[in-house]
Design a protein with these regions (language model features):
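Short, Lys/Arg-rich flexible segments
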Residues: 1-201
């Protein structure tokens, strides 16, 4: 037989008073954690914007190969095959600004879980226009073939308007891989893990 427990008005009042305090406590913690996450995010975005690859692609089809990936020939915007007027960096910026903070309370402490985009998720929003399933952002780090047949000229056949792939070989040489998003994100994740390890008693 189940025992019934009566709730006195005094007990009910204590519970009602405790709920707002608990909500205020949780909100205060979340605001503090969010401030730290935004600071780490700010550093990530600053490093992303000043990276030579970002600068070069942001310069569009008339940019120069400041990243050194093409041996000074043409630019990444036209080499990747981005259509004139497109903003290939936009989806990356949107993803880098995303985060989710969740907290789990116990009697002794509050555990923090922070979710931010992975490199794999970002690679999915940076497709190579001419190679289904491949990412240009990942290709910066692993290599993008075609430098030998790349011709940096104004052409109506070009997506960007300033670069085409020819049938015959134009030069020797190969794409020079560069560290990019994976490296930037690795440092970002270290900062996020430090914030997560913060336990609040």
């Amino acid at each position: 037989m189940a025992l019934r427990k009566s709730v006195t008005l005094g007990t009910l009042k204590e519970v009602q008073q405790a709920v707002p305090r608990e909500m205020a406590y949780t909100k205060g913690i979340k605001n503090s954690i969010e401030k730290k996450v935004k600071e780490a995010q700010k550093h990530l975005l600053e490093n992303f914007e000043k990276h030579p690859v970002t600068i070069e692609i942001a310069s569009g089809p008339q940019g120069t190969n400041v990243s050194g990936t093409l041996g000074g020939i043409g630019n990444l915007f036209s080499y990747i095959g981005v259509s004139a007027g497109d903003k290939p960096l936009g989806p990356i910026r949107i993803m880098l600004k995303q985060y989710d903070i969740r907290m789990h309370h116990s009697k002794k402490k509050t555990t923090i879980n922070i979710t931010v985009p992975t490199a794999t998720e970002i690679f999915r929003v940076t497709p190579l226009p001419w190679a289904t399933g491949r990412s240009w952002a990942k290709g910066i780090e692993t290599g993008i073939s075609g430098l030998g047949t790349y011709l940096n000229i104004d052409s109506s056949r070009s997506r960007s308007g300033t670069g085409i792939q020819t049938k015959g070989k134009q030069r020797a040489g190969r794409f020079k891989n560069r560290t990019y998003l994976s490296s930037l994100l690795k440092n970002y994740y270290k900062e996020i893990r430090k914030i997560e390890k913060t336990t609040i008693s």
